[in-house]
């Protein structure tokens, strides 16, 4: 109980007095990484997948697009994520998905959840393979723990890329809330992913992150959609 009380007091101390007004996040320097979470009603999973595939294929032709991938959550096929990289802020802002949102509105179970990031610990962008296990994790810590968490995530990414079966391991930092991160992992198969979970550096990371976490460690598994 005392640990959580100290955590709450630390968060409160980090909030400036009179900080009710929010300022827009600064423009991202370099590539813009976007993770968009989409959820449709369970009975419309196939329709949602078809619309999202059309959107993905069309967006790949847009100027400045460097990645446009579509994945479907394992065990919950009505939930999807779109993973994109745009060359720069201008290319991202010129890209529009209003038409997609209008088409999905009749079947959506929740509003789109867009997470816009800069690349924090990114390496080669391996192509998404059909057999891959895709893992998306949202890491949230209070602002005073941001820098410590960045160091932990960088260490984790470096160690994880050396594991057998790893095809991608990147950390993205949210532009509007720099104490929030998205971790994108690609593993050759479930066996490789399970080995990663059991690895010493992974468990050490979770042990150190736990006391600093501002929310549940949100890790979800997906399959690629062609």
Task: Identify the meaning behind each predicted range.
Residues 6-17:
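Bacterial N-terminal signal peptides
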Residues 42-65, 100-104, 145-168, 201-205:
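Short amphipathic alpha-helical segments
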Residues 61-64, 89-92, 101-105, 110-113:
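Short helix C-cap/helix-to-loop transition motifs enriched in small/turn-promoting residues
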Residues 22-30, 69-78, 102-134, 138, ...:
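Glycine-rich beta-strand-turn "strand-cap" elements at beta-sheet edges
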Residues 31-38, 69-96, 132-140, 170-197:
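Short, well-ordered beta-strand segments in beta-rich or mixed alpha/beta enzyme
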Residues 55-63, 96, 108-111, 164, ...:
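Sec/Tat-exported extracytoplasmic proteins
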Residues 1-4:
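N-terminal secretory signal peptides that target proteins for export/translocation
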């Amino acid at each position: 109980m005392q640990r959580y009380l100290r955590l709450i007091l630390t968060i409160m101390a980090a909030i400036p007095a009179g900080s009710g007004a929010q300022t827009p996040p600064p423009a991202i320097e370099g590539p813009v990484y976007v993770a968009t979470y989409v959820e449709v009603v369970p009975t419309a999973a196939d329709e949602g997948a078809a619309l999202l595939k059309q959107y993905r294929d069309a967006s790949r032709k847009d100027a400045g697009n460097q990645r446009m991938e579509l994945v479907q959550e394992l065990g919950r096929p009505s939930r999807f994520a779109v993973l994109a990289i745009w060359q720069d802020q201008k290319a991202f802002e010129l890209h529009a998905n209003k038409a997609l949102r209008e088409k999905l509105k009749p079947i959506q179970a929740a509003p789109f959840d867009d997470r816009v990031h800069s690349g924090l610990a990114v390496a080669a962008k391996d192509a998404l393979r059909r057999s891959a296990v895709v893992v998306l994790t949202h890491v949230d810590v209070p602002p005073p723990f941001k820098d410590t968490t960045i160091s932990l995530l960088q260490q984790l990414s470096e160690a994880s890329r050396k594991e057998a079966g790893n095809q991608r391991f990147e950390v993205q930092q949210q532009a509007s809330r720099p104490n929030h991160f998205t971790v994108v992992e690609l593993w050759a198969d479930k066996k490789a992913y399970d080995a990663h979970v059991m690895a010493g550096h992974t468990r050490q990371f979770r042990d150190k992150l736990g006391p600093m976490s501002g929310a549940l460690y949100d890790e979800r598994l997906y399959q690629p959609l062609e």
